[in-house]
Amino acid sequence: MTEEPIKEILGAPKAHMAATMEKSPKSEVVITTVPLVSEIQLMAATGGTELSCYRCIIPFAVVVFIAGIVVTAVAYSFNSHGSIISIFGLVVLSSGLFLLASSALCWKVRQRSKKAKRRESQTALVANQRSLFA
């Protein structure tokens, strides 16, 4: 089965090909085509989870944070203030904190948008109910 019917069934536009031209040592022109990915194809490939990255970041952030704590604790247990390992531990620790904070921020923004959508749908429902009983 070819890919074209599947793309048409999914409603995805046909992928355009980006062409790059390169010259080979023998003065021949070689054209390389690279398919471009559309947002619909990305959604189909990820199962619609591209908007929930905060859920994927949390486990990774926790592991990075714990690794940062361990490396920093080992570095400072040897009283090596300012050494490469202590700086590396602090960088890993701060990146873990940053990932946790960004995940929490994304979660808050997502919750606010869900509340706003819920409020809009309730407003429309109440307005529709009033027009039915008026």
UniProtKB/Swiss-Prot annotation:
<keyword id="KW-0217">Developmental protein</keyword>
<dbReference type="GO" id="GO:0001701">
    <property type="term" value="P:in utero embryonic development"/>
</dbReference>
<keyword id="KW-0963">Cytoplasm</keyword>
<dbReference type="GO" id="GO:0051930">
    <property type="term" value="P:regulation of sensory perception of pain"/>
</dbReference>
<keyword id="KW-0221">Differentiation</keyword>
<dbReference type="GO" id="GO:0005783">
    <property type="term" value="C:endoplasmic reticulum"/>
</dbReference>
<dbReference type="GO" id="GO:0007219">
    <property type="term" value="P:Notch signaling pathway"/>
</dbReference>
<dbReference type="GO" id="GO:0043204">
    <property type="term" value="C:perikaryon"/>
</dbReference>
<dbReference type="GO" id="GO:0005886">
    <property type="term" value="C:plasma membrane"/>
</dbReference>
<keyword id="KW-0472">Membrane</keyword>
<feature type="transmembrane region" description="Helical">
    <location>
        <begin position="84"/>
        <end position="104"/>
    </location>
</feature>
<keyword id="KW-0812">Transmembrane</keyword>
<dbReference type="GO" id="GO:2001214">
    <property type="term" value="P:positive regulation of vasculogenesis"/>
</dbReference>
<feature type="transmembrane region" description="Helical">
    <location>
        <begin position="56"/>
        <end position="76"/>
    </location>
</feature>
<keyword id="KW-0256">Endoplasmic reticulum</keyword>
<dbReference type="InterPro" id="IPR032536">
    <property type="entry name" value="TMEM100"/>
</dbReference>
<dbReference type="GO" id="GO:0030509">
    <property type="term" value="P:BMP signaling pathway"/>
</dbReference>
<comment type="subunit">
    <text>Interacts (via C-terminus) with TRPA1 and TRPV1. Interacts with TASOR.</text>
</comment>
<comment type="function">
    <text>Plays a role during embryonic arterial endothelium differentiation and vascular morphogenesis through the ACVRL1 receptor-dependent signaling pathway upon stimulation by bone morphogenetic proteins, such as GDF2/BMP9 and BMP10. Involved in the regulation of nociception, acting as a modulator of the interaction between TRPA1 and TRPV1, two molecular sensors and mediators of pain signals in dorsal root ganglia (DRG) neurons.</text>
</comment>
<dbReference type="GO" id="GO:0050848">
    <property type="term" value="P:regulation of calcium-mediated signaling"/>
</dbReference>
<dbReference type="GO" id="GO:0071773">
    <property type="term" value="P:cellular response to BMP stimulus"/>
</dbReference>
<protein>
    <recommendedName>
        <fullName>Transmembrane protein 100</fullName>
    </recommendedName>
</protein>
<dbReference type="GO" id="GO:0060842">
    <property type="term" value="P:arterial endothelial cell differentiation"/>
</dbReference>
<dbReference type="GO" id="GO:0001525">
    <property type="term" value="P:angiogenesis"/>
</dbReference>
<dbReference type="GO" id="GO:0045603">
    <property type="term" value="P:positive regulation of endothelial cell differentiation"/>
</dbReference>
<keyword id="KW-1003">Cell membrane</keyword>
<keyword id="KW-0597">Phosphoprotein</keyword>
<dbReference type="GO" id="GO:0001570">
    <property type="term" value="P:vasculogenesis"/>
</dbReference>
<dbReference type="GO" id="GO:0003198">
    <property type="term" value="P:epithelial to mesenchymal transition involved in endocardial cushion formation"/>
</dbReference>
<dbReference type="GO" id="GO:0051897">
    <property type="term" value="P:positive regulation of phosphatidylinositol 3-kinase/protein kinase B signal transduction"/>
</dbReference>
<dbReference type="Pfam" id="PF16311">
    <property type="entry name" value="TMEM100"/>
</dbReference>
<feature type="modified residue" description="Phosphoserine">
    <location>
        <position position="121"/>
    </location>
</feature>
<keyword id="KW-1133">Transmembrane helix</keyword>
<dbReference type="GO" id="GO:0048471">
    <property type="term" value="C:perinuclear region of cytoplasm"/>
</dbReference>
